[in-house]
Protein backbone atom coordinates (compact mmCIF):
# COMPACT_ATOMS: atom_id res chain seq x y z
CA UNK A 1 0.00 0.00 0.00
CA UNK A 2 2.84 2.41 0.84
CA UNK A 3 4.63 1.74 -2.45
CA UNK A 4 1.38 2.27 -4.38
CA UNK A 5 0.70 5.57 -2.59
CA UNK A 6 4.27 6.73 -3.21
CA UNK A 7 3.96 5.76 -6.88
CA UNK A 8 0.79 7.88 -7.06
CA UNK A 9 2.81 10.84 -5.77
CA UNK A 10 1.32 10.97 -2.29
CA UNK A 11 3.59 12.31 0.45
CA UNK A 12 3.64 9.20 2.62
CA UNK A 13 6.37 7.32 4.38
CA UNK A 14 6.67 4.18 6.44
CA UNK A 15 9.13 2.87 8.97
CA UNK A 16 10.13 -0.36 10.61
CA UNK A 17 11.95 -1.22 13.82
CA UNK A 18 14.77 -3.70 14.50
CA UNK A 19 12.51 -6.12 16.38
CA UNK A 20 10.43 -6.74 13.26
CA UNK A 21 13.55 -7.53 11.24
CA UNK A 22 14.97 -10.06 13.70
CA UNK A 23 12.60 -11.39 16.39
CA UNK A 24 10.04 -14.19 16.02
CA UNK A 25 6.92 -15.15 17.92
CA UNK A 26 8.10 -18.66 18.71
CA UNK A 27 11.59 -17.69 19.90
CA UNK A 28 10.56 -14.70 21.97
CA UNK A 29 6.89 -14.39 22.88
CA UNK A 30 6.55 -18.12 23.54
CA UNK A 31 9.23 -18.29 26.24
CA UNK A 32 8.28 -20.17 29.44
CA UNK A 33 7.42 -18.66 32.82
CA UNK A 34 5.94 -15.46 31.41
CA UNK A 35 9.35 -14.44 29.97
CA UNK A 36 7.63 -13.81 26.64
CA UNK A 37 5.96 -10.75 28.16
CA UNK A 38 9.29 -8.94 27.70
CA UNK A 39 8.63 -8.94 23.95
CA UNK A 40 5.06 -7.63 23.84
CA UNK A 41 4.92 -4.74 21.36
CA UNK A 42 2.67 -3.26 18.67
CA UNK A 43 2.40 -4.36 16.04
CA UNK A 44 3.12 -7.82 17.45
CA UNK A 45 6.18 -9.84 16.54
CA UNK A 46 5.27 -12.28 13.75
CA UNK A 47 5.42 -16.06 13.64
CA UNK A 48 8.51 -17.85 12.38
CA UNK A 49 6.24 -19.54 9.86
CA UNK A 50 5.57 -16.26 8.10
CA UNK A 51 8.63 -14.39 9.39
CA UNK A 52 10.88 -15.27 6.47
CA UNK A 53 8.44 -13.75 4.05
CA UNK A 54 7.51 -10.95 6.45
CA UNK A 55 11.09 -10.09 7.39
CA UNK A 56 12.41 -10.40 3.83
CA UNK A 57 9.62 -8.05 2.70
CA UNK A 58 10.72 -5.53 5.33
CA UNK A 59 14.36 -5.72 4.21
CA UNK A 60 13.23 -5.33 0.60
CA UNK A 61 11.13 -2.32 1.60
CA UNK A 62 14.21 -0.74 3.17
CA UNK A 63 16.30 -1.43 0.06
CA UNK A 64 13.63 -0.04 -2.28
CA UNK A 65 12.93 3.07 -0.14
CA UNK A 66 9.35 1.94 0.48
CA UNK A 67 10.34 2.02 4.15
CA UNK A 68 12.06 5.36 4.67
CA UNK A 69 13.57 4.95 8.12
CA UNK A 70 14.42 2.49 10.85
CA UNK A 71 13.15 3.82 14.15
CA UNK A 72 12.87 2.05 17.48
CA UNK A 73 9.59 3.03 19.09
CA UNK A 74 11.87 2.98 22.14
CA UNK A 75 9.61 2.11 25.04
CA UNK A 76 11.47 0.04 27.65
CA UNK A 77 9.89 -1.55 30.69
CA UNK A 78 11.38 -3.58 33.54
CA UNK A 79 10.12 -7.13 33.63
CA UNK A 80 9.82 -7.49 37.40
CA UNK A 81 8.06 -4.25 38.21
CA UNK A 82 6.19 -3.50 35.00
CA UNK A 83 5.75 -6.34 32.49
CA UNK A 84 4.60 -8.76 35.23
CA UNK A 85 1.60 -6.50 35.89
CA UNK A 86 -0.04 -8.48 33.11
CA UNK A 87 0.64 -11.94 34.55
CA UNK A 88 -3.10 -12.55 35.07
CA UNK A 89 -4.39 -10.14 32.44
CA UNK A 90 -2.52 -9.83 29.13
CA UNK A 91 -4.03 -6.39 28.49
CA UNK A 92 -2.10 -4.99 31.47
CA UNK A 93 1.34 -5.83 30.05
CA UNK A 94 3.07 -2.53 29.21
CA UNK A 95 3.50 -2.55 25.47
CA UNK A 96 6.96 -1.80 24.08
CA UNK A 97 10.61 -2.69 23.71
CA UNK A 98 13.88 -0.81 24.11
CA UNK A 99 15.86 -0.13 20.98
CA UNK A 100 17.78 3.14 20.86
CA UNK A 101 21.01 1.71 22.23
CA UNK A 102 21.39 -1.06 19.63
CA UNK A 103 19.54 0.27 16.57
CA UNK A 104 22.60 1.23 14.56
CA UNK A 105 24.43 -2.06 15.11
CA UNK A 106 21.32 -4.16 14.47
CA UNK A 107 20.67 -2.44 11.16
CA UNK A 108 24.38 -2.61 10.30
CA UNK A 109 24.01 -6.37 10.68
CA UNK A 110 21.73 -6.09 7.65
CA UNK A 111 24.70 -4.64 5.74
CA UNK A 112 26.86 -7.58 6.87
CA UNK A 113 24.16 -10.05 5.77
CA UNK A 114 23.75 -8.36 2.38
CA UNK A 115 20.23 -7.11 3.10
CA UNK A 116 21.16 -3.42 2.85
CA UNK A 117 23.94 -1.36 1.28
CA UNK A 118 26.21 0.73 3.46
CA UNK A 119 24.79 3.88 1.85
CA UNK A 120 21.21 2.80 2.50
CA UNK A 121 22.11 2.05 6.15
CA UNK A 122 23.24 5.67 6.55
CA UNK A 123 20.16 6.97 4.70
CA UNK A 124 17.62 5.01 6.78
CA UNK A 125 19.27 5.69 10.12
CA UNK A 126 20.65 9.23 9.67
CA UNK A 127 20.01 11.22 6.50
CA UNK A 128 16.30 10.53 5.98
CA UNK A 129 15.34 11.13 9.64
CA UNK A 130 17.23 14.45 9.52
CA UNK A 131 15.29 15.45 6.38
CA UNK A 132 11.94 14.38 7.86
CA UNK A 133 12.48 16.43 11.00
CA UNK A 134 13.66 19.51 9.08
CA UNK A 135 17.23 19.30 10.36
CA UNK A 136 18.93 18.54 7.04
CA UNK A 137 21.51 19.75 5.91
CA UNK A 138 22.71 20.78 9.38
CA UNK A 139 22.30 17.13 10.44
CA UNK A 140 22.34 13.85 8.55
CA UNK A 141 25.28 14.60 6.26
CA UNK A 142 29.03 15.08 6.45
CA UNK A 143 29.56 18.26 4.46
CA UNK A 144 30.94 21.80 4.83
CA UNK A 145 28.57 23.84 7.00
CA UNK A 146 26.91 20.79 8.58
CA UNK A 147 27.26 20.00 12.26
CA UNK A 148 30.19 17.70 12.91
CA UNK A 149 28.08 14.91 14.41
CA UNK A 150 30.35 12.05 13.48
CA UNK A 151 30.38 8.48 14.72
CA UNK A 152 33.48 6.38 14.32
CA UNK A 153 32.18 2.91 13.50
CA UNK A 154 34.13 -0.30 14.02
CA UNK A 155 32.48 -2.84 11.71
CA UNK A 156 34.31 -5.68 13.46
CA UNK A 157 33.20 -4.81 17.00
CA UNK A 158 31.20 -7.60 18.63
CA UNK A 159 28.29 -6.77 20.93
CA UNK A 160 26.17 -8.99 23.12
CA UNK A 161 22.68 -7.68 23.69
CA UNK A 162 21.37 -8.48 27.16
CA UNK A 163 20.66 -7.01 30.56
CA UNK A 164 24.31 -6.79 31.56
CA UNK A 165 26.06 -3.72 30.22
CA UNK A 166 22.89 -1.91 29.15
CA UNK A 167 23.03 1.85 29.39
CA UNK A 168 19.28 2.15 29.75
CA UNK A 169 18.23 1.39 33.31
CA UNK A 170 14.53 0.72 32.75
CA UNK A 171 14.81 -2.55 30.89
CA UNK A 172 15.73 -6.15 31.41
Walk through the language-model features, giving the residues of each.
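Glycine/Thr-rich phosphate-binding loops of Rossmann-like dinucleotide-binding domains
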Residues: 22, 78-80, 160-161
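A structural signal for short secondary-structure junctions
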Residues: 62-64, 142-146, 167-169
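Short, surface-exposed loop/helix-turn segments at secondary-structure junctions
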Residues: 32, 86-90, 160-172
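Short amphipathic alpha-helical segments
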Residues: 3-4, 82-84, 164-165
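His/Asp/Glu-enriched, well-ordered alpha-helical/loop segment
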Residues: 69, 76-155
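Short secondary-structure transition/capping segments
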Residues: 38-42, 66-71, 116-119, 164-172
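Non-catalytic surface loops within mature trypsin-like serine protease
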Residues: 18, 154-157
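Histidine/acidic residue-rich metal-binding segments in metalloenzymes
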Residues: 1-70, 75, 86
